[in-house]
């Protein structure tokens, strides 16, 4: 039913107080939770029966007052004994947070999206419509029917209340039913623990990280962009000079003519539109002529400029002055987190220009959490963040006070100079996981002695003392170490190292002869996956894989490579998620003013007042190194600095 009068609201709230568990689904005006206003609240606590509370709608609609509903719902949602079901709950928690409702972590019950991700990590979508068809075998009202799609999309505010109510109520009802089915399936398949104790408690940690965001120095990005423009122009002139005439570097057609017709370079591979000019081809051709190398550099720099230097400033939130990336919990089938808008996990750090982008990510005290809230809401500072706020705790938000709040906190002599970033990075985490799984004596001993693992492997395979290992030998050992994790073929290794296939094959054989435990682990993993149909991580996360052959040779096919990699990379992902929970818990317990901002695969980035850095270093290192007991010690490298590029070991 539609709850659109104060009397109906009072009656519903009275009933709602008695429900230990219900599903809430918010309809909003925006996909960005920090800009979204709530259009309506859909609530369901038993199948087939849902309520809709409209707070925004077309002119003339009968609506409830938004602030009144927020106040009424606050006491219910902030009650730690409640259990709340919701599809993609991370989004709704952020919207609620921006409206001053801080839902306790323990309140989160089942998010069908996250549950389905554990049951079927390779699925193309874990969206609500997909899940309704998959588990309940029915179709639901599509959001497209309500607001259209593409250019003609209208805002949820303009959907008639009856239509919005029908859509939202059905969503809440079906989400509740899905939650029960998915719970049963998770328990049946032995995945409930992984959901309840790892993925579920991670949600509020990600909410907090996304809400805090990270400060970006837009002026620094503009300066870097300007200097890249100059370099790109110079490069273009050099390229045209070598070719002997001007042409469009970004046109594959024109590039084909220059490389293969004019310079007569050999065609390495064909596509539908003629000879390929992709990265791999250019890298091969670069050995024969200087032009392809210049093209590679030009492509790299123009991608950096477009994707990061020019795009990042526009992603800075106007009200917080920070970038708020989204951490995706249900995208990577290995169990890793991914990040988007912007993707901070693939800033290329292999080149000086790519690495320099990190200089623009800086430490800063100011997070105007109040600035996130909509005008008219009154917001309460969360207990764990008391140190960041003024003495009085409740702020009615209007545009003017929002600005003064921001000012008052910046002017307290606690300038940005007094804050720093802290980066904590697991050292060789995947190779340590490999040592743990394979129980290979040589590998374990090297890690126990704390020697450089690539040097140790080079010494073993080349049969020389560690002191005598050359830089080139170490580089080869490093390529093999990582090649093993990803099941690289002699052909792939040869290409990576620029040696011939026979030499690469001999090197791989030498490696497996010395590290027989690793060879055995790979064999056993492939037999298990062949038998069960899935690879399993250290915490029991599964990834389904077909195509493991019964009679294999040394060079693995794609599914076999995926199988080995899923166990290693997936277990490393489990480990860092455990570490995030442990660090977050300790920061809250000790009311430490530091805060976790980013997770970049094996690295966590924090921000802290300089005075509190020593305690944060200890806390982070201790929790990360003890997140899980492996057969080899976990080592964490911690460094501190004003920005993400220039940090010094702590």
Feature-to-residue mapping (PLM):
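Short, basic/hydrophobic alpha-helical segments
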Residues: 65-81, 360-363
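C-terminal polymerase-core module
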Residues: 230, 234-237, 241-294, 513-561, ...
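Conserved "right-hand" nucleotidyltransferase catalytic core of DNA-directed polymerases
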Residues: 1-59, 87, 104-107, 123, ...
């Amino acid at each position: 039913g539609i709850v659109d009068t104060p009397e109906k609201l009072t009656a519903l709230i009275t009933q709602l107080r008695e429900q230990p568990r219900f599903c809430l689904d918010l309809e909003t005006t925006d996909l960005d939770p920090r800009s979204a206003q709530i259009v309506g609240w859909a609530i369901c606590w038993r199948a087939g029966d849902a309520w809709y509370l409209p707070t925004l709608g077309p002119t003339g609609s009968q609506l409830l007052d938004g602030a009144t509903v927020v106040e009424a719902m606050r006491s219910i949602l902030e009650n730690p004994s409640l259990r709340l079901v919701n599809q993609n709950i991370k989004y709704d928690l952020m919207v609620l947070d921006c409206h001053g409702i801080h839902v306790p972590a323990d309140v989160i019950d089942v998010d069908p999206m996250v549950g389905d991700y554990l049951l079927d990590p390779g699925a193309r979508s874990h969206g609500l419509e997909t899940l309704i068809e998959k588990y309940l075998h029915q179709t639901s009202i599509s959001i497209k029917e309500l607001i259209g799609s593409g250019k003609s999309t209208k805002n949820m505010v303009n959907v008639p209340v009856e239509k919005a109510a029908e859509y939202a109520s059905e969503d809440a009802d079906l989400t509740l039913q899905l939650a029960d089915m998915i719970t049963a399936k998770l328990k049946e398949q032995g995945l409930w623990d992984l959901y309840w104790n790892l993925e579920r408690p991670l949600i509020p940690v990600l909410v907090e990280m996304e809400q805090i965001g990270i400060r970006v120095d837009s002026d620094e990005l503009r300066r870097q962009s300007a200097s890249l423009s100059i370099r790109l122009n110079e490069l273009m002139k050099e390229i045209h000079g070598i070719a002997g005439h001007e042409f469009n570097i970004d046109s594959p057609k024109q590039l084909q003519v220059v490389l293969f017709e004019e310079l007569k370079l050999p065609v390495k591979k064909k596509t539908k539109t003629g000879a390929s000019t992709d990265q791999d081809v250019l890298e091969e051709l670069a050995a024969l002529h200087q032009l392809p190398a210049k093209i590679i550099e030009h492509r790299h720099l123009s991608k950096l400029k477009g994707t990061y230097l020019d795009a990042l400033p526009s992603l800075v939130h106007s009200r917080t002055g920070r970038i708020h990336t989204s951490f995706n919990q249900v995208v990577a089938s290995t169990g890793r987190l991914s990040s988007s808008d912007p993707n901070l996990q693939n800033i290329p750090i292999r080149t000086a220009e790519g690495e320099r982008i990190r200089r623009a990510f800086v430490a800063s005290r100011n997070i105007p959490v109040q600035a996130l809230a909509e005008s008219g809401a009154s917001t309460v500072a969360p207990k764990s963040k008391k140190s960041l706020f003024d003495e009085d705790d409740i702020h009615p938000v209007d545009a003017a006070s929002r600005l003064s709040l921001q000012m008052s906190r910046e002017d307290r002599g606690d300038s940005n100079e007094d804050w720093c970033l802290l980066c904590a990075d697991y050292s060789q985490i995947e190779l340590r996981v490999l040592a743990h799984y394979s129980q290979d004596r040589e590998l374990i001993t090297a890690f126990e002695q704390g020697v450089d693992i690539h040097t140790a492997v080079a010494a073993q395979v080349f049969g020389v003392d560690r002191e005598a290992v050359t830089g080139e030998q170490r580089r080869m050992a490093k390529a093999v170490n990582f090649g093993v994790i990803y099941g690289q073929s002699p052909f792939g290794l040869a290409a990576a190292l620029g040696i011939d296939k026979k030499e690469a094959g001999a090197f791989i054989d030498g490696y497996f002869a010395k590290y027989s435990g690793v060879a055995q682990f790979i064999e056993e993993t492939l037999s298990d996956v062949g038998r069960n149909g899935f690879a399993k991580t250290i915490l029991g996360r599964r990834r389904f894989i077909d195509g493991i052959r019964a009679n294999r040779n040394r060079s693995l096919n794609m599914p076999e490579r995926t199988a080995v990699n899923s166990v290693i990379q997936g277990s490393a992902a489990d480990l860092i998620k455990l570490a995030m929970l442990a660090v977050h818990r300790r920061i809250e317990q000790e009311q430490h003013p530091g805060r976790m901002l980013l997770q970049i695969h094996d690295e966590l980035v924090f921000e802290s007042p300089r005075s509190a850095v020593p305690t944060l270093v200890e806390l982070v290192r201790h929790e990360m190194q003890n997140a899980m007991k492996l057969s080899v010690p976990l080592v964490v490298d911690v460094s501190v600095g004003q920005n993400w590029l220039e940090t010094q070991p702590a």
